[in-house]
From Swiss-Prot:
Transit peptide limits: 1-39
Name of the protein described by the UniProt record: Peptide deformylase, mitochondrial
Taxonomy of the source species: Eukaryota, Metazoa, Chordata, Craniata, Vertebrata
Broad class of enzyme this protein falls into: hydrolase
Organism: Homo sapiens
Named cofactor requirement(s): Co(2+)
Co-factor: note: Binds 1 Co(2+) ion.
Length: 243
């Protein structure tokens, strides 16, 4: 998920536990994709009550209402195309509605289906005027940041229109709390289908082109940290930590 700032987004190990709020259960985090051997990460500790709630209600199902974080295998796989029979159907409609819902709630400017645990080629893009105005005018001009309405693409493809590389900081909701400078092409064309199967094409430059490239990368299992200048990698809270 691309952030505006950056200035750009159960497999329980069931165990018997004593009755009590302080008790905890060790579990592995869920993913819609199996993790490679040896990189599952440490078992998390879940309180007894959270464990019980999950046991009764079951684990959340994709598309999630949260954003998957780096380390989740779903972010590293290549997303599969949506089948033609699914176009205009309830499953795709639910996915696109959830993408828009989470994107707006998180106040980010782009979101891809893999970030909600669904390895399919679907993405949503939107830069509302109100969100755009939160960026200082000089910065908006420098980064060619202009608002644009909601656009949803299914099975999109990308064509570079201007291969000049422009470098600015980016963030991502799937690498929460971090920014880095990333080079992107100045102008691109994205083409694909809307959720009803109608052909859509958009030529974009500047910040909009950056957002498109960021989200298209997600469909290929690529994160901004794979393309960043590693010396610019920044924790956005570093000053707060030192305060």
């Amino acid at each position: 998920m691309a952030r505006l700032w950056g200035a750009l987004s159960l497999w329980p190990l069931w165990a018997a536990v004593p009755w009590g709020g302080a008790a905890a259960v060790g579990v592995r985090a869920c993913s819609s994709t199996a993790a490679p051997d040896g990189v599952e990460g440490p078992a998390l500790r879940r309180s007894y009550w959270r464990h019980l709630r999950r046991l009764v209600l079951g684990p959340p199902e994709p598309p999630f209402s949260h954003v998957c974080q780096v380390g989740d295998p779903v972010l590293r796989g290549v997303a599969a195309p949506v089948e033609r029979a699914q176009l205009g159907g309830p499953e795709l409609q639910r996915l696109t509605q959830r993408l828009v819902q989470v994107m707006r709630r998180r106040r980010c400017v782009g979101l891809s289906a893999p970030q909600l645990g669904v390895p399919r080629q679907v993405l949503a893009l939107e830069l509302p005027e109100a969100l755009c105005r939160e960026c200082p005018p000089r910065q908006r001009a420098l980064r060619q940041m202009e608002p644009f309405p909601l656009r949803v693409f299914v099975n999109p493809s990308l064509r570079v229109l201007d291969s000049r590389l422009v470098t600015f900081p980016e963030g991502c909701e799937s690498v929460a709390g971090f920014l880095a400078c990333v080079p992107r092409f100045q102008a691109v064309q994205i083409s694909g289908l809307d959720p009803n199967g109608e052909q859509v094409v958009w030529q974009a430059s500047g910040w909009a082109a950056r957002i498109i490239q960021h989200e298209m990368d997600h469909l290929q299992g690529c994160l901004f940290i794979d393309k960043m200048d590693s010396r610019t990698f920044t924790n956005v809270y570093w000053m707060k930590v030192n305060d």
